[in-house]
């Protein structure tokens, strides 16, 4: 009896093992049969999640990015053309023509300055002011500006003119393949206004020619172009912020309008302290909501 009692669990155990093995084989077989379906379901689930994530963030901003690249290329193409006219006048010794072409040529650059700043040394090579870099490395527009307005001569500027044009053409070549995304655009818009606040509205940028308002206007235009490309996405997420930014761009441009002079702008020296104060106030009023655009867009 004891023997039978002792052997019964062994039989049960053996039977259990056998049944378990069969069960495992069936489960494995079922798993193998279900794997393609499960994989398909998992893939569909992942794709659905990705689509939902993209919908949650609003957009991948491809249209806006493509639009900004096209805008940048258009501006840089014209920048190269106008810079060549300017440098030709410098090399020809035509002081008056060189002075008249200086500020208009720079506007094309100032509108897309975030692009140049993203390309290493190109921005300081083209746009560094006296004191921004070592004296031996100073070149670009402001080096020539000093000679034209302070020294009243084009002498000794031929090499600087050639190098400036070469740098402009290099900028054009590099923009074709550079990475541009919504983050660069949003950051760039804010940086353009920071540029205005730190140097243009103070009259420090064009310390010899006093053509700061050209740069001021171009920076604002560049920032507005970025906003225009992203405003539909922004409005979908925060209608009030979108309207606030639009209104404050309008207010700033209205404040700047009286200083237009034909196709250009009056000398910065003609601005009164009250004029500078109003421009600064309108600039600050725009900068604050514009700085929130990136967070709302999720970039």
Task: Label the predicted regions.
Residues 1-9:
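Bacterial N-terminal signal peptides that target proteins for export
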Residues 8, 18-49:
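Bacterial lipoprotein signal-peptidase II cleavage site
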Residues 46-299:
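Mature extracytoplasmic or organellar-lumen-exposed domains after removal of signal/transit peptides
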Residues 2-3, 30, 41, 105:
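Generic cytosolic/nucleocytoplasmic N-terminal low-complexity/intrinsically disordered segments
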